[in-house]
Regions:
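Bacterial N-terminal signal peptides that target proteins for export
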Residues: 1-12
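Bacterial N-terminal signal peptides
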Residues: 10-21
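Intrinsically disordered, low-complexity cationic segments
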Residues: 22-23, 245
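Boundary at the C-terminal end of the N-terminal hydrophobic targeting segment
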Residues: 25-31
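Primary mode marks residue(s) on the alpha4-beta5-alpha5 output face of response regulator receiver
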Residues: 31-246
């Protein structure tokens, strides 16, 4: 049993395919990842961590404009899960996602993945709980199949709540690393719902700026809208995300 491809990862590929920066073959690889991968097992935990605490805080905050992220709670990854590094004042929470929640199956154990995100209060009380739980499981060495079963069971037992109204996320960072297949994503916003019809947003229709993905296992619907600026205020153009290197 293979773990489902992360909805965020699918969206990452969809964004770049729509913008013409990823070849069709790469998108197909996301849909059916090859079992031949350099990330067939968990790397040493230290490779998933960032030794520079200040650098991880700054990377997490880069997900949203400074006017939002400066007063947000910031979480950094410890050996057993996310830990609060900075207390927030405005209800937002920022963190740097790792491979277990941010990439495709073939890169489930890729220790290089770093995906900055800032969620609002509604998402912090719903969507973020799933991310933190999956991160704990990943650090504990759960296999993709085990994690897939665990998240479904936790939702069925109502240990993880449905999405709160208004739950959303800023992913506007120039920094980070989305994985070897699609290293850099466009600047975008995400909106989270529980079991919502994609058609209600006109998602994925010709000419629509809205990308949508529904996950029946997690009863989660995610909508994405690309925005025209990075979090630092500079203009987003097709290409810089793909050309930006670390």
């Amino acid at each position: 049993m293979s773990r489902k491809i992360s909805a965020i990862a699918i969206i990452g590929f969809a964004l770049l395919v729509v913008l013409g920066t990823v070849h069709q073959a790469m998108a197909q690889a996301a849909a059916a990842p090859s079992p031949a991968t350099p990330y067939s097992k968990m790397a040493p935990i230290d490779q998933y961590l960032m030794a520079d605490r200040a650098a991880e805080i700054a990377l997490a905050r880069s997900a949203a404009p400074e006017s939002i992220s400066r007063d947000a709670e910031v979480m950094i990854l410890g050996r057993h899960g996310f830990e609060t590094a900075v207390k927030g004042k405005n209800g937002f929470a920022c963190a740097v996602g790792r491979s277990w929640t941010s990439t495709v199956d073939a890169e489930f154990w890729n220790p290089k993945v770093r995906v900055p995100a800032c969620v609002n209060a509604a998402a912090a009380r719903s969507y973020l709980l799933r991310v933190t739980k999956e991160t704990e499981w990943g650090l504990a060495g759960r296999t993709p199949a085990q994690m897939n079963a665990a998240i479904a069971a936790a939702i069925a037992r109502k240990e993880l709540p449905p999405m709160e109204p208004g739950a959303m996320c800023y992913m506007m960072s120039k920094e980070g690393y989305g994985g070897d297949s699609v290293p850099h994503w466009p600047s975008h916003l995400m909106f989270f719902y529980s079991d919502t019809d994609l058609a209600s947003w006109g998602a994925n229709l010709p000419g629509s700026p809205v990308i949508g993905v529904s996950d029946s296992v997690e009863h989660l619907t995610q909508f994405v809208v690309v925005v025209q600026r990075w979090s630092d205020g500079t203009e987003y153009r097709e290409g810089p995300a793909a050309e930006h290197h670390h």
